[in-house]
Regions:
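Alpha-helical transmembrane segments of integral membrane proteins
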Residues: 84-91, 196, 200
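Membrane-interface transmembrane-helix boundary segments in multi-pass integral membrane proteins
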Residues: 188-198
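Generic signal for short, ordered secondary-structure residues
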Residues: 81, 85, 105-106, 190
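Interfacial helix-start motif at the membrane-water boundary
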Residues: 67-88
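Membrane-interface extramembranous regions at the lipid-water interface
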Residues: 2-73, 94-123, 130-164, 169, ...
Length: 233
């Protein structure tokens, strides 16, 4: 009777410089959804301001440094706006951390220099004009280097288009309004604000899907490179 022996196999190739990305992706996804929820909440308050109508005393910011006392609804809008800002900061911290990991992993997988230097992971969000394309470019470059030959998911472009639209028509790239100015805009013309909030919510949801798609593609590539086939005979 012959004995069955295990034939030793060569160890799987090791990819050096990889960073764990699954936990960062999960936290980033939840942070994006939390930020989207914040924009939903602020949209509700903007509708409440619009339906209530501007008080007879006029807008909160009456010009020349004069501000009238806020009513209870306006005070609560300030609080909601503050909470939205907090969720955006949390989202930014997790998102940038995820971007760093995905970018570093793409370099380890491809052994090629990234298209954008590391400082663009931060500055790409805040420099005028550059912030219209560089953050998306960093992610797209990391995806293409991680899975060469695979088409960039459409959700990457959809997420970025919604983000830029939401920032442009609301409070960001064009408007730098205080909460009091936003209250005034809600009283007199709420629709641009609501379009902005809707776009930001959609950007949060598509961003969640984008993070999952990019992370899944990268982890799949890593798994294919590090798998150890077993042969028995």
């Amino acid at each position: 009777m012959s004995e069955q022996k295990t034939i030793p196999t060569a160890p799987a190739p090791q990819v050096h410089g990889l960073r764990p990305v699954e936990t960062a992706a999960r936290l980033t996804g939840w942070a994006l959804l939390l930020a989207g929820l914040g924009h939903v909440l602020r949209a509700v308050w903007e509708i409440r301001l619009w339906t209530a109508g501007e008080p007879a005393s006029g807008p909160p910011d009456q010009g020349e440094g004069v501000h009238r006392p806020l009513n209870s609804l306006e005070n609560s809008y300030h609080l909601v706006t503050f909470l939205v800002g907090v969720t955006m900061v949390i989202c930014a911290v997790f998102f940038i951390s995820w971007m760093w990991r995905v970018r570093d992993n793409s370099v380890a997988l491809s052994r090629e220099r990234p298209k954008y230097a590391g400082f663009w992971v931060y500055l790409g969000w805040v420099l005028p004009v550059a912030n219209l394309w560089i953050p998306r470019g960093v992610i797209a470059d990391a995806y293409r280097k991680s899975v060469p030959g695979r088409k960039l998911p459409a959700v990457v472009t959809a997420w970025w288009a919604l983000w830029v639209f939401g920032m442009a028509c609301g409070t960001g790239l064009i408007y730098r309004d205080s909460a009091d100015k936003l209250i005034e805009r809600a009283y007199t013309g709420v629709w641009p604000l609501l379009f902005s909030e809707a776009a930001m919510v959609a950007a949060a949801v598509t961003g969640f899907l984008m993070v999952r798609a990019v992370t899944a593609a990268q982890t799949e590539r890593v798994a294919s490179l590090t798998a150890q086939p077993r042969a028995e005979g």
